[in-house]
């Protein structure tokens, strides 16, 4: 049975969904995630995403990015591990329970090729520039076979659907999520 609903993401929701920490827990207990984020011009997006993941309880966070982001990461979020872009290999994705892709990634041919390849076979959280790339490749939405969470703000969501009034937003979001079998977190003043 398909579940479809719109619910604000607020403190009450978060408190219900965040696991209690175990006395004998370790970084492997709380999730092993990869962030494919950041570029020379948008370092902050990668750094904020890494810090948010660590501070909300992720166990092991690895950031795949360029040298400038990695250098800043060691100061801004020393709990996160890193991998420089030029050393990336698909084996680095093995064992990851979640992947975030797109926050400040940048829009260029290399990013587009990589996003298209990664989205074709990996469960991911899709944000920022990866959403822009995905909007250019709707066939990926129609043919994906893994769990996807899309996190657009209203402007990014307009790249996928037409809506004229905010009152249409919830209906459009529900229809989109149902059609493409994705979880949609529509960011805004009242995140759904």
Residue ranges and their predicted role:
Residues 1-123, 132-149, 154, 158-192:
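Small-residue (G/A/S/T)-rich helix-start motifs and N-terminal tracts that mark the onset
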């Amino acid at each position: 049975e398909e579940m479809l609903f719109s619910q604000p993401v607020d403190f009450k929701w978060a408190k219900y969904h965040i696991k209690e920490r175990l006395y004998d827990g370790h970084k492997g207990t709380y999730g092993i995630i990869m962030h494919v984020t950041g570029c020379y011009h948008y370092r902050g997006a990668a750094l904020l995403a890494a810090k948010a993941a660590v501070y909300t309880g992720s166990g092991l966070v690895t950031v795949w990015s360029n040298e400038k982001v990695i250098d800043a990461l060691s100061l801004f979020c020393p709990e996160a591990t890193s991998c420089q872009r030029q050393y990336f290999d698909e084996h680095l994705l093995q064992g990851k329970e979640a992947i975030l892709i797109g926050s400040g990634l940048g829009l260029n041919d290399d990013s587009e090729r990589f996003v298209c390849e990664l989205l074709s076979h990996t469960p991911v959280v899709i944000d920022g520039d990866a959403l822009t790339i995905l909007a250019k490749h709707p066939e990926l939405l129609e043919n994906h076979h893994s769990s996807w969470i899309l996190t657009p703000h209203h402007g990014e969501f307009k790249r996928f659907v037409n809506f004229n009034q905010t009152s249409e937003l919830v209906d459009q979001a529900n229809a989109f999520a149902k059609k493409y079998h994705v979880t949609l977190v529509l960011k805004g003043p009242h995140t759904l």
